């Protein structure tokens, strides 16, 4: 029974505060990015979400170059919000089953050539800023940006020239 209907955005705002106490900060950051950048612009004003709308959303994201994995992760967040709203009595929810095309080609990422990498690294060295330093460390070590952002001085052994990666953060 639905009483006091709410929009998906209203439900998501309440869900975020409830969910925050049960998940790590980095997990919550991923949920919030998914909501703000993808889900709420499409579903935020709606009082219910149909299978047809979710299917159209998934295909649109796929056509814009997102991977099935990324889209499935977004749909997990949407499902958590919708189920939360249903549990609170703010909306009715009928389970959806989203289908993805069977022969979706894998997206290929462009890779820097050695010459382009050297040119970029020279630029970063000649134009020092802390963000440029982070990019330079990524290019030089193969670390991910979240690993570089989480580095502490204690992770760097100047005697041996070793860098110890002990944590990561979500930007």
Regions found by a protein language model. Name each.
Residues 161-163:
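Hydrophobic residues embedded in beta-strands of well-ordered beta-sheets
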Residues 166:
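Radical SAM [4Fe-4S] cluster-binding motif and immediate context
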Residues 2-5, 97-99:
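Short, basic/polar amphipathic helix motif occurring as a linker/hinge flanking DNA-binding modules
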Residues 68, 72, 87, 91-92, ...:
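Basic, Lys/Arg- and aromatic-enriched nucleic-acid-binding interface segment
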Residues 3-84:
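Short, Lys/Arg-enriched alpha-helical recognition elements, typified by the DNA-recognition helix
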Residues 1-2, 92:
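A short N-terminal helical cap/helix-turn-helix that marks the beginning
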């Amino acid at each position: 029974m639905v009483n006091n209907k709410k929009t998906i955005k209203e439900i998501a705002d309440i869900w975020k505060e409830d969910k925050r106490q049960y998940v790590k900060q980095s997990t919550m950051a991923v949920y919030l990015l998914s909501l703000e950048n993808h889900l709420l612009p499409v579903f935020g004003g709606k009082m219910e979400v149909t299978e047809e709308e979710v299917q159209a959303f998934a295909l649109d994201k796929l056509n814009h170059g997102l991977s099935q994995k990324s889209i499935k992760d977004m749909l997990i967040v949407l499902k958590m919000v919708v189920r939360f709203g249903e549990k609170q009595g703010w909306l009715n929810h009928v389970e959806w089953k989203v289908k993805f095309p069977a022969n979706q080609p894998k997206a290929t990422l462009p890779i820097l050539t050695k010459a382009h990498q050297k040119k970029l690294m020279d630029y970063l060295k000649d134009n020092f800023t802390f963000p440029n330093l982070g990019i330079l460390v990524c290019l030089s070590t193969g670390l991910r940006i979240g690993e570089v952002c989480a580095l502490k001085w204690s992770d760097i052994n100047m005697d041996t020239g070793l860098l110890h990666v002990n944590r990561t953060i979500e930007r």
